[in-house]
Amino acid sequence: SGPLVRSMLQVRLGMGSRVFARNCEVREIGTEAAAVFLERNHLYGHARARYRFGLFRFRSTGAGEATMDSTQPLVAVAAFSKGREMTDGTMSYEWVRYASVRGVRIVGGMGRLLDAFVMDRTGKDCPGAFEVMTYCDLEWYDGRSYHRLGFEDAGLRPPVAFMCPVDGGRRIHEGKLTTDRRFRHLLQDGSGAGERMVRILNTGSRKLILRCGV
């Protein structure tokens, strides 16, 4: 949506508020709480996930940080998939979503939530090493945030097609027009043109992998 994109740009330009992850605590959260937060604060909304963690503020340490009354308690959410056993016997999890509350940059937030997930999974499902993989949207990021967390590049994914109303509004993954009943009404002539929609492509994504317990 327009307001979300504008808030993301403001944060990228250093115009948003800051919250320090050291002033927050990590808690597991439920499906509904994660979905509500991600629908409001992630460009692609929520996604199916098995593990969901939230970052909750409990204090502010002053200069350079948003006041406690200027943000809600839940300021960031990370969601991870169910583990999948690889051919070598290790488990692989996907980091499906990460988002901070609109207009706020959480300094150290990605690392705090990732560490919580890794600690939660260590020694479970499959003993020994496991991996966390994710995709970086090249429209917004170049992967450096993930590299700082220890992720390594593992290839590129081609651009993805979306349908978008010409008068604005949220873009819809092209595949959802046929697979998601919420959007089937847009398919009047098989292309979405009946609803004045245009086909656009993003710039693709970068695959990254973090190897844990090695």
Language model segments and positions:
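C-terminal "cap" of GNAT-fold acetyltransferases
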Residues: C164-A193, M197-V214
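A conserved beta-strand-loop-helix scaffold within acyl/acetyltransferase catalytic domains
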Residues: M8, M15-A161, G168-G169, N202-R211
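A polyampholytic, Gly/Pro-enriched intrinsically disordered region
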Residues: V11-R18, R181-H185
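Extended, hydrophobic interaction surfaces within ordered domains
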Residues: S1-Q10
